[in-house]
């Protein structure tokens, strides 16, 4: 008998949570159109860029929805150049295991963990974003078994730097129908990321949520460059011209489908200096103008932004200010979105 774990309660299966907050038929039809548009970017049929943009973590429903409504206002101004995919990141990997782990753990960041309420809260938030703004959003797949709770709502899925080498993440990604971005690991080994993409693009038989499953492979699995950390804990970028050319060479050698990279402008690429994100995006666009190879694989950016600049402790209660990594505030975010559209 195991003594170090308690099984508290059986949680509802995804079908039950989906029935509680269903995707209405009219939005299912709109999602099919949205999915096609985003897929066309990653397959090279559409020369727009995607912006996966939003808070580091979705900490409270009202502030996240306020932010997404602001994105909806900007969307009309840039729709010919950009496809905006809001980030609603509802579960957060923690380097040491401590700290806020996201809405799926704590729908109220100041209350005790409640994963039943968390599963309901994340489904409700994604559904509200769709119904109020017609945005289908992105989330990080921290727990592969939880993906099914949101599988009909998400337009984009990210695999984090600490998860990209994990077999269950790779195999689950191979059965997902929308683009899945694989981040380079925290140590920076690009081959690990490319191995992850290779695995996700192939068919597999595997165990998932108590079932024996067969996936067909995800041709839209692709790379995310997020910088890396050396053995001393120092941050190093990997978005420069030389990095992108090196990725193009290594990617090409793999013979993978739909070569694509999204550049994460924060994390180790910025050294978590959130105000550097506009400069980083502009440098990558400059590289695209100077190399057709780089331009052919750069499909967009991942940007951390919220209503207010910076970050805060949970107890400070500043509306729309991150309680995890520092984010770009709204005024700078709007300016950046418009600038990116102008530079394409």
Question: What are the residue ranges of the model-derived segments?
Answer:
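N-terminal beta-rich core of secreted/periplasmic extracellular enzymes
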Residues: 27-40, 44, 74-85, 91, ...
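N- or domain-start disorder-to-order transition segments that initiate the globular core
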Residues: 1-45
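Active-site-facing alpha/beta catalytic cores
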Residues: 2, 9, 68, 81-246, ...
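Conserved, mostly hydrophobic/aromatic
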Residues: 54, 263, 329
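Acidic (Asp/Glu)-rich catalytic clusters
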Residues: 42-45, 72-79, 127-132, 215, ...
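Conserved phosphate/anionic-ligand binding catalytic regions in large, soluble enzymes, centered on
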Residues: 50-63, 325
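Internal helix-turn-beta structural module
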Residues: 306-344
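Short acidic, Gly/Ser-rich segments with clustered Asp/Glu that frequently serve as metal-coordination loops
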Residues: 56-59, 258, 266-272
């Amino acid at each position: 008998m195991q003594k170090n774990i308690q099984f508290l309660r059986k949680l509802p299966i995804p079908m039950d949570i989906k029935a509680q907050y269903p995707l209405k038929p009219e939005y299912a039809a709109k999602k099919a159109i949205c999915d096609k548009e985003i897929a066309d970017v990653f397959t090279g049929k559409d020369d727009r860029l995607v912006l996966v943009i939003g808070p580091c973590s979705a900490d409270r429903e009202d502030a996240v929805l306020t932010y997404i409504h602001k994105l909806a206002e900007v969307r009309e101004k840039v729709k010919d150049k950009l496809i905006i995919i809001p980030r609603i990141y509802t579960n957060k990997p923690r380097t040491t295991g401590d700290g806020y782990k996201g809405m799926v753990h704590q729908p109220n960041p100041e209350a005790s963990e409640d994963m039943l309420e968390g599963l309901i809260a994340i489904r409700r938030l994604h559904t509200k974003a769709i119904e109020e703004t017609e945005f289908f959003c992105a989330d990080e797949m921290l727990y592969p078994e939880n993906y099914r709770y949101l599988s009909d709502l998400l337009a984009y899925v990210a695999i984090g730097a600490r998860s990209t080498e994990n077999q269950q993440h790779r195999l689950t990604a191979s059965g997902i129908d929308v683009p899945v971005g694989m981040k380079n690991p925290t140590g920076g080994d690009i081959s690990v990321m490319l191995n992850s993409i290779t695995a996700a693009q192939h068919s597999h038989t595997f165990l998932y949520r108590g079932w024996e499953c067969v996936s067909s492979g995800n041709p839209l699995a692709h790379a995310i460059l997020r910088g890396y950390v050396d053995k001393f804990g120092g941050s190093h970028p990997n978005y420069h011209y030389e990095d992108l050319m090196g990725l193009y060479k290594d990617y090409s050698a793999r013979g993978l489908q739909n070569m694509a990279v999204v550049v994460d402008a924060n994390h180790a690429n910025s050294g978590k200096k959130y105000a550097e994100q506009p400069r980083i995006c502009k440098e990558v666009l400059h590289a695209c103008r100077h190399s057709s190879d780089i331009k052919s694989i750069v499909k967009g950016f991942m940007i951390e932004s919220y209503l207010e600049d910076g970050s805060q402790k949970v107890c400070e209660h500043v509306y729309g200010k991150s309680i995890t990594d520092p984010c770009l505030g709204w005024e700078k975010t709007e300016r950046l979105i418009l600038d990116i559209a102008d530079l394409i």
